[in-house]
């Protein structure tokens, strides 16, 4: 890898190519255009149909049923959510009317895990009252819990480089019961990958640092982190400067948001990419090329005196002064060996089948189970990763801001029908292709069995539901969705030593390429990806 030189400024009226049109690409374009409205920016989208947003996709059926085919909420606590919301309001103030939230005390903020000792039993975690606490302690989920806590507090085991989440947790907690029975479920829900195949340095670098500083993750977690609070303030001030809004305004919004577990949009998550895209398409210097598949990228190096910028040629027919890679094709041909090696190390992402379930007039979810949904731990040996109770989330949404729309004000409860069911099931299809899946078999194996077992619906009622013409089941195969952030790739809890930081710096300073998206963000969430886009755009200035 080359030593870095001083970053040369993009020329006035220069050209920038942005690969992809997902949320990362859209926000990168927005942030860069705020700083440099003179630049000609072209987004290159592989798909021929004019839908932007990547994995974010709210589908409306011909019966106007809203189904989320990707993420459906944002975490209020994530500082990137504040950046997203402030940016969208700046683009279009009417977005305020679309913003909704879930309260911390709401049913939709409850979460369950499947008990591996009794797979038909859902156990609330964390338990919210004494009876639920006793239920948790009696379940298989609590096996080894007390021993694990004391082992972490008193163990003097030393951190190792490049540990998997599984190896780290077993070393800290003394055995694998807690990670197999509880922790693995959370990682299945986020990454759709086994904890043995995930890098601890990537997934939980803060816990790695807590162990290094305090010798125990529990002791470290109990310490007040003043550095983190100061970093948050500095980050918010950077956001405010770029968006040209008052520091105190963005700080107040973040303060309000961070106590809210979930943020959503009335018309669905596609509100987010659609708002950004509609704003960008009004700009004469921004263009989108649909049906353009980026397969090859060639960096024409700058002259020996480093006076001129390198130019980048895409597919031998488009040339740009700068290229931003938000979407990086797995088979991208590029004359940069270190990037190629990193992409090969990540390998193919996970394959997940999403099963959307909807019934317009029947509520299958009992009051005792009303929650965000449930996850399935590793010890259950099931391909079912988890189930999201969309109808519970929707019926618990509240407006984030007083509406400026009189029509909306008249209808304060925008989900008035409590007697419907909407759920999304996530099934691991790792190693399978779309053609390998029999939808009827999956309907029997996962849909029917979930209704019978976890939702405890009598078999006669389940058969009636399955044969009901109003019962909608839709399948979406998410191919190569989330990268596998494996150990030994080069992730580090020290950001300056992380392979992503090293590559970012080399690509930008030596080759005039910036990067973003899931393969370079600090985490797999939408706010993480947008913050990465913000940082990438700001580095160019």
Language-model-detected regions and their locations in the chain:
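Eukaryotic N-terminal low-complexity, Ser/Thr- and Lys/Arg-rich leader segments
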Residues: 1-14, 221-230, 238-249, 304, ...
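Conserved flavin/dinucleotide-binding core of flavoenzymes
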Residues: 6-7, 15, 126-129, 386-541
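N-terminal Rossmann-like FAD-binding beta1-loop-alpha1 element of flavoenzymes
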Residues: 8-43
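Conserved Rossmann-like nucleotide-cofactor binding loop
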Residues: 24, 49, 330
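Glycine-rich FAD pyrophosphate-binding loop
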Residues: 33-60
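Mid-domain catalytic core of redox enzymes
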Residues: 35, 290-423, 431-432
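Dinucleotide-binding Rossmann-like beta1-alpha1 core, especially the glycine-rich loop
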Residues: 62-155
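Active-site/ligand-binding neighborhood in enzyme catalytic cores
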Residues: 150-293
